[in-house]
Amino acid sequence: MKLSVSPPPFDGAPVVVLIAGLGGGGSYWLPQLAALEQEYQVVCYDQRGTGNNPDTLPEEYTLAQMAGELAQALTAVGITRYCVVGHALGALIGLQLALDTPDALKALVCVNGWLTLNAHTRRCFQIRERLLHAGGAQAWVEAQPLFLYPADWMAARAPRLEAEEALALAHFQGKNNLLRRLNALKKADFSRHAARMACPVHLICSADDLLVPSVCSSELQAALPHSHSVVMRQGGHACNVTEPETFNTLLLNGLASLLHSHEPAL
């Protein structure tokens, strides 16, 4: 699997791995790259079956496979100790890494993640799946911004949304791959395992997230033994895109706090 690895800003710089959500593309994190690369060696990637890592995913694709593929790719380029910043599905992959490769994961930032799928989030995905089956990629892509962005933000950026839609259609991951990744996401449940996650976790969520209610982060924090959280007042599901200055400050402060906190013995 191809990775994009930035040069370290100084010798011994910590490594931060960025994991996108269901869309899978590493470009999702573009608003964060400049700020992060001043202090960290940053790894971005397109998840298997998306972007520049095209593949046909197996029918019973799992979250554990997603995490394993990333861990293997990082090891292959000599990265054996790192922090993860994950958004939604990316946060779930980070949680899976915390279980499966605890010696490798120094710290985790979960953005709009969850412990187990909330009934509201399930409803949103059911609606989106119906749109996909009825109207194909076009319908999925056209509806996507409604779940990602606040209404006022979208209303002020119609040309940008049109350009994003065209790009998303041109690079659509394919119906089968999308549904297999989505099924893996829906099956994820950390409620029985969160208590044994040893790495420190910082949670960021947005109070106006339409897709993943902010209570999901509260539930996740309550289940994780070494965690703290912050709630953005606005920004929607893609709060790192719509409110990058606020988000980047919270992210950098959160990472600094995690890396300077006492890591529990593994």
Swiss-Prot record:
Keywords: Hydrolase. The keyword Acetylation does not apply. GO terms for molecular function: hydrolase activity, acting on carbon-nitrogen (but not peptide) bonds, in linear amides. Its EC number is 3.5.1.-. SUPFAM superfamilies: alpha/beta-Hydrolases. GO terms for biological process: nitrogen utilization; uracil catabolic process. The keyword Hydrolase applies. It catalyses: carbamate + 2 H(+) = NH4(+) + CO2. InterPro entries: AB_hydrolase_1 (IPR000073), AB_hydrolase_fold (IPR029058), AB_hydrolase_sf (IPR050266), Pyrimidine_utilisation_RutD (IPR019913). It is an enzyme of class 3 (hydrolase). Involved in pyrimidine catabolism. May facilitate the hydrolysis of carbamate, a reaction that can also occur spontaneously. Belongs to the AB hydrolase superfamily. Hydrolase RutD family. This is Putative carbamate hydrolase RutD. The gene is rutD.
